[in-house]
C-alpha cells in the first residue's frame, strides 16, 4: 500500500494559479506493436518526456552531379510555415531564422544526403510547438522550433496507386484549418487510410465537407487532373478549395505545365468531372508525382479508371515527374530558381543540359485566387 502524504508546505495554496510550475513527476505507459499491449505504468520523477523528434505526435535535400547539396524551394516552405503558425497562435518564425536553421540541419547531416544517382532524398521536417507547462486554453509562454532530417525513399514509390474517396470522414471543416499544415489535419485520417489499404487502395481522396461534390485533395498529397483534347491540347486543372494545403509540388507542376505550353486552370473541380480527365496525379513533397490508376467512391463503389493494371505512370505524369526530378538533382538548367545550394562543392564540374520548353504561349486561368499556404513545412534537398 502506497503511503499518502499530507499537502506540501512548499506551496501557498491560497495563491496557486494554473501557470504555477511545480516540476511534478508523471506516469508513462508505452504501447509496442511487437507485443500488442501497453506496458505497466511507471512513475517518472521528472516533468519532461524523452521522445524522438520525428515522432508523429509532434508532427528533403538532394545531391547534385557535382557533389553539391541543394535544398528545394526553402523560401516557399518558409512562407507556408509562417502562414500555418499564424493560424494556431505560434509566434512568427522569421524567414531568415527558418532558412538558417534548415541550412544548419542539412550541412550538419550532409553525409546523409543520398548520392545523386539515387531516387532517395534527405527529408527535412521543420516543426514548431508550444513547449512550456500550460493546462488552460491560453497561449504558452515558450515555444520550440526544430528541424529534423532523415534520408527516405519516395513516399508512394514509383507505382500508380488506386485511390478511394472517403465518404464517412471529413478531412477539414469549411472554415477550419484544412489550409494549414497542422497535426490535427493528419492524425485523424490514419485510421481511414489503414482501412483503405486493407481494402486494396494505396491512397485516400477527400471531397469538400460542405457539399460533398467537389475535389479537395488526397490525404498525403495535392490533386491534379490532366485533360487532353482530340487535337492534342493539354490542360492541367488544380482545385482552388480554401480548405487545402498550398502544395509546393503542385505549384511546381503548374509552373512546369505553363513552361511546356499547356493550359493551366485553378478552380473548383466537381466530382462528376473525374471521368473527363485523361490522367490524375497526386503531388507532394514526399510523394513527388504519382499517377492514379483509378478512383473509387467509397459508398457506391463507382470507379473511374485512368491506367490499366500493367501501366505504372501516365505519359504526362512522367513528363512532369522527370522534369521535376531533373531540376531537383540539377541535371538540367534551373530556369525557375528553385534550388538553393548550400556548402562547398567537393568534386569536378559536370555540365547540365538545358530544359526543354514549348514555343506555344502558355495560358493560365486563375478562376479562383483564394489559395492557402501550409505550415510545419516538409521538403527536400537535392
Curated annotation (Swiss-Prot):
Molecular function (Gene Ontology), one example: branched-chain-amino-acid transaminase activity
Q: What class of enzyme is it?
A: transferase
**Known EC number(s)?**
2.6.1.-
Q: Which InterPro entries match?
A: Aminotrans_IV, Aminotransferase-like, B_amino_transII, BCAT-like_C, BCAT-like_N
Pfam families reported in the protein's UniProt record:
Aminotran_4
Q: In which pathway does it act?
A: Mycotoxin biosynthesis
Keyword tRNA processing attached: no
Tell me yes or no: is Coiled coil among this UniProt entry's keywords: no
* Top-rank lineage group of the source organism: Eukaryota
Hey, what's the signal peptide range on this chain?
Answer: none
Swiss-Prot/TrEMBL cofactor(s): pyridoxal 5'-phosphate
Q: Locate the residues binding pyridoxal 5'-phosphate.
A: 80, 217
List every position bearing N6-(pyridoxal phosphate)lysine: 181
Could you give a single Gene Ontology term from the biological process aspect? branched-chain amino acid metabolic process
The record's keywords, sorted A to Z, are: Aminotransferase, Pyridoxal phosphate, Transferase, Virulence
Similarity field: Belongs to the class-IV pyridoxal-phosphate-dependent aminotransferase family.
**What does the record give as the function of this protein?**
Aminotransferase; part of the gene cluster that mediates the biosynthesis of gramillins A and B, bicyclic lipopeptides that induce cell death in maize leaves but not in wheat leaves. The nonribosomal peptide synthetase GRA1 incorporates respectively a glutamic adic (Glu), a leucine (Leu), a serine (Ser), a hydroxyglutamine (HOGln), a 2-amino decanoic acid, and 2 cysteins (CysB and CysA). The biosynthesis of 2-amino decanoic acid incorporated in gramillins could be initiated by a fatty acid synthase composed of the alpha and beta subunits FGSG_00036 and FGSG_11656.
Protein name in the entry: Aminotransferase FGSG_00049
Source species of the chain:
Gibberella zeae (strain ATCC MYA-4620 / CBS 123657 / FGSC 9075 / NRRL 31084 / PH-1) (Wheat head blight fungus)
Record lineage: Eukaryota, Fungi, Dikarya, Ascomycota, Pezizomycotina
Amino acid at each position: 500500500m502506497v503511503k499518502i502524504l499530507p499537502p506540501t508546505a512548499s506551496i501557498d495554496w491560497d495563491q496557486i494559479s494554473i501557470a504555477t510550475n511545480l516540476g511534478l513527476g508523471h506516469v508513462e505507459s508505452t504501447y509496442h506493436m511487437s507485443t500488442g499491449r501497453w506496458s505497466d505504468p511507471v512513475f517518472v520523477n521528472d516533468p519532461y518526456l524523452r521522445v524522438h523528434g520525428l515522432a508523429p505526435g509532434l508532427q528533403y535535400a538532394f545531391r547534385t552531379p557535382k557533389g553539391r547539396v541543394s535544398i528545394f524551394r526553402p523560401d516557399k516552405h518558409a512562407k507556408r510555415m509562417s502562414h500555418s503558425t499564424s493560424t494556431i497562435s505560434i509566434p512568427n518564425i522569421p524567414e531568415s531564422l527558418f532558412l538558417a536553421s534548415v541550412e544548419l540541419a542539412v550541412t550538419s547531416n550532409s553525409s546523409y544526403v543520398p548520392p545523386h544517382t539515387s531516387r532517395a532524398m534527405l527529408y527535412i521536417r521543420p516543426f514548431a510547438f508550444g513547449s512550456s507547462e500550460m493546462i488552460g486554453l491560453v497561449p504558452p509562454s515558450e515555444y520550440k522550433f526544430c528541424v529534423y532530417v532523415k534520408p527516405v525513399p519516395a513516399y508512394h514509390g514509383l507505382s500508380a496507386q488506386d485511390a478511394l474517396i472517403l465518404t464517412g470522414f471529413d478531412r477539414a471543416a469549411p472554415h477550419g484549418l484544412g489550409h494549414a499544415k497542422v497535426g490535427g489535419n493528419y492524425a485523424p485520417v490514419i485510421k481511414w487510410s489503414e482501412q483503405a489499404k486493407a481494402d486494396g487502395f494505396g491512397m485516400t481522396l477527400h471531397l469538400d465537407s460542405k457539399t460533398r461534390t467537389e475535389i479537395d485533395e488526397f490525404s498525403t498529397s495535392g490533386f491534379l487532373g490532366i485533360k487532353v483534347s482530340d487535337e492534342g491540347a493539354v490542360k492541367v486543372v488544380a482545385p482552388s478549395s480554401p480548405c487545402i494545403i498550398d502544395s509546393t509540388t503542385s505549384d511546381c507542376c503548374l509552373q512546369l505545365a505553363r513552361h511546356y505550353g499547356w493550359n493551366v486552370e485553378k478552380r473548383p473541380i466537381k466530382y462528376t468531372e473525374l471521368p473527363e480527365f485523361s490522367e490524375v496525379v497526386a503531388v507532394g513533397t514526399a510523394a513527388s508525382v504519382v499517377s492514379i490508376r483509378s478512383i473509387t467512391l467509397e459508398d457506391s463503389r463507382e470507379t473511374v479508371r485512368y491506367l490499366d493494371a500493367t501501366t505504372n505512370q501516365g505519359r504526362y505524369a512522367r513528363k512532369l515527374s522527370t522534369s521535376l526530378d531533373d531540376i531537383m538533382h540539377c541535371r538540367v538548367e534551373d530556369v525557375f530558381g528553385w534550388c538553393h545550394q548550400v556548402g562547398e562543392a567537393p568534386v569536378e564540374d559536370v555540365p547540365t543540359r538545358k530544359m526543354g520548353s514549348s514555343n506555344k504561349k502558355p495560358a493560365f486561368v486563375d478562376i479562383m485566387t483564394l489559395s492557402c499556404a501550409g505550415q510545419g513545412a516538409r521538403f527536400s534537398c537535392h
